[in-house]
Amino acid sequence: MAAITAALIKQVREDTGAGMLDVKKALTEAEGDVARAKEIIRAKGIAAAGKREGRKAQEGTIASKVVETANGETGYAVELNSETDFVAKTPKFVEFTEEVLGYAVDADANSADELLEAKAGDTTVKLAVEEAAALFGEHVKVGQFAKISGEHVEVYAHKKSAEMPPSIVAMIATDKAGAAVAHEAALQISAMGAKWLTREDVPADVVESERRVATEKSLAEGKPEKIVPKIVEGRLNAFFKEVVLLEQPFVKDPSKTVGDLFKEVGGNATAFARVEVGKGEEE
């Protein structure tokens, strides 16, 4: 049996992220065999991960990447959640999030479910995440996933502070001409949280719900019935300006809309996505 030295304990702790007592127990059980000790830690951790699954995991970070394709570019964004920001900002957690993003790109995944089934070395992303939960001692899960494609894809990653990893990632796909204002549009998406690109993209049931609310509100305010339809249309237009990207006032110059930015350069936006840590379950 190999001597269980402080150096050995340090090595296993650095490689696994497990606590000192857990490492000592694993090394003792493995009779000083480092590889076997790591296996023990992983096995025990995966079993414990099931107990953590019921716990809230709404902290975390987002990794993003743009890759070239035959038709232009594709952007990917993957949110990885933890229970605390203490874990989320550790270099190992950020590094693991980047690894998961890499698996998404390699598999050309189209959803979080596809990503979980993708290969991660000699295992799957789902199992790799369960192992990570064991190492970090918290419930860890893949959260939101976004993928968009276009002639050009711009990505902006927003951090709350310099020492924290990204908490918001905004991506926008444009044609070649639109690339000139894509960065400004990505900043807008991050700051203002548009939900749809054009008003035609807003689901009919959402529009009808807003129309009913606006009608009931106008009548409750005692507005003359004959002018209610005009008031309702005005309120619907205000709603569209809030939730439709191309109709939002541009944050740097509210005298124009985001759509105006693209008109000025003769370009078009074709798709966008916004991922914010902890917002997936709320929405």
Swiss-Prot record:
Domain of life of the organism encoding this protein: Bacteria
Gene Ontology CC terms: cytoplasm
Disulfide pairings: none
CDD domains xref list: UBA_EF-Ts (cd14275)
Cross-referenced SUPFAM superfamilies: Elongation factor Ts (EF-Ts), dimerisation domain, UBA-like
Stretch list, region Involved in Mg(2+) ion dislocation from EF-Tu: 84-87
Protein keywords: Cytoplasm, Elongation factor, Protein biosynthesis
Subcellular location: Cytoplasm
Cross-referenced InterPro entries: EF-Ts_dimer_sf (IPR036402), Transl_elong_EFTs/EF1B (IPR001816), Transl_elong_EFTs/EF1B_dimer (IPR014039), Transl_elong_Ts_CS (IPR018101), UBA-like_sf (IPR009060)
GO MF term list: translation elongation factor activity
Family membership noted in the UniProt record: Belongs to the EF-Ts family.
PANTHER family, A to Z: ELONGATION FACTOR TS, ELONGATION FACTOR TS, MITOCHONDRIAL
Physiological role: Associates with the EF-Tu.GDP complex and induces the exchange of GDP to GTP. It remains bound to the aminoacyl-tRNA.EF-Tu.GTP complex up to the GTP hydrolysis stage on the ribosome.
Protein name in UniProt: Elongation factor Ts
Protein source organism: Bifidobacterium longum (strain NCC 2705)
